[in-house]
A protein has these predicted regions:
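Glycine-rich, basic loop-to-helix element that forms the pyrophosphate-binding segment
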Residues: 66-83
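Conserved nucleotide-sugar donor-binding catalytic segment
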Residues: 138-219
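Short, acidic, metal-binding catalytic loop of nucleotide-sugar glycosyltransferases
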Residues: 26-36
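Cell-envelope/extracellular polymer assembly enzymes that use nucleotide-activated donors
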Residues: 6-9, 38, 185
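Catalytic core of nucleotide-sugar-dependent glycosyltransferases
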Residues: 206-209, 214-241, 259-272
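Acidic helix N-cap motif at the loop->helix transition within catalytic regions
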Residues: 47-55, 96, 100
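Flexible acidic/His/Gly-enriched loops in nucleotide-sugar-dependent glycosyltransferase catalytic domains
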Residues: 58-60, 74, 102-170
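Short aromatic/hydrophobic "clamp" motif used to bind/position activated sugar donors
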Residues: 88
Length: 306
């Protein structure tokens, strides 16, 4: 096998979204990348079922069940452990790669031996609007990720060296409630070892829609973010980053109609960063000035999350 085209294993967790899954898998199998591509579809809490008429040369489709903790994190880990490629990539079942994604990303990762993990820019598609999102720098440090989630480093664009993933970074955390923010938690660990290489091209389409599994799970979001802060205490070294998470917790409480905790968390947020907009949004929602649903929709139209 040529060193320039190592085998890539792509892990696609899925649950009850067959049409979206077929779109994602088609984009993976039709990559222009010249090396072998193994597409591992991991069925979470469902039976493997994805008939495929014919595979392109050098492409392999493997269907497995999640044998670990039910949910996204366990399914992703089941795929990682079953992967045979030198490189491991992630793709959510409702997203799709552009044809040259792997070709360009693998080349950049191989040209940057100090990097173990790479991402690419994204095209966020919500309803009839598409927004381009690129990381602020090509090498994203741990400190930058403490300060900001950087949505541009989307899990559907992750490409990692399998050995470093298993030996240094570790698997996805299956204890985080509802698998919410499991990608951010994993990136925090990855960036401790080396900066994350962010290819400055939008090479994946990220679809935001009402069937997204985290669109309305406010209680889970509160639990997961609290878990994240407890686990990564170095967040306290970056007040603006901690304020962002506190603001998300405040917003979630406000969305649930829990005015007292929403205002309490908003005050904690503003004590760290008076410019954190999520605190003001949480206060506005708690006062009945606007609904959480409206705020979320407007953010998505702009290609942003809460």
């Amino acid at each position: 096998m040529a060193a320039e085209t190592p085998a890539v294993s792509v892990v696609v967790p899925t649950r009850d979204r067959p049409e979206l899954l077929r779109r994602a898998v088609t984009a993976i199998l039709e990559q222009t990348y010249q090396g072998p591509v193994e597409c591992l579809v991991v069925f979470d809490q469902s039976d493997p079922d994805l008939p495929w008429a014919e595979l392109p040369a050098g492409r392999h489709l493997v269907l497995i069940q999640n044998q670990r903790t039910p949910g996204l994190a366990g399914a992703r880990n089941s795929g990682i452990l079953a992967a045979t490629g030198e490189l491991v990539a992630f793709c959510d079942d409702d997203d799709e790669w552009l044809p040259e994604k792997l070709e360009r990303q693998v080349a950049r990762l191989l040209a940057t031996p100090s990097a173990a993990v790479s991402t690419t820019g994204i095209l966020v598609r919500y309803q009839d609007r598409t927004t381009t999102r690129l990381a602020p720098t090509e090498l994203v440090t741990h400190r930058q990720l403490l300060r900001s989630r950087l949505t541009e480093l989307h899990p559907s664009t992750v490409l990692a060296r399998r050995r470093q993933l298993l030996d240094e970074i570790g698997l996805v955390d299956e204890q985080i409630p509802g698998s919410y923010a499991e990608d951010y938690e994993w990136l925090l660990r990855a960036s401790r070892h080396a900066p994350v290489l962010a290819v400055p091209e939008p090479l994946a389409v990220i679809h935001w829609h009402q069937s997204s599994f985290f669109s309305d799970r406010w209680r889970t979001i509160i639990s997961a973010l609290t878990y994240l802060v407890d686990k990564h205490q170095d967040l306290e070294a970056e007040p603006s980053g901690l304020a962002r998470i506190y603001g998300q917790i405040a917003f979630a409480h406000a969305a649930l109609g829990e005015r007292r905790p929403a205002r309490s968390w908003a005050r904690r947020t503003l004590s760290l960063n008076r410019r954190e907009r999520r605190a003001y949004l949480a206060l506005a929602i708690s006062l009945g000035l606007i609904s959480a649903k409206t705020v979320t929709r407007l953010a998505h139209v702009a290609g942003k999350g809460i």
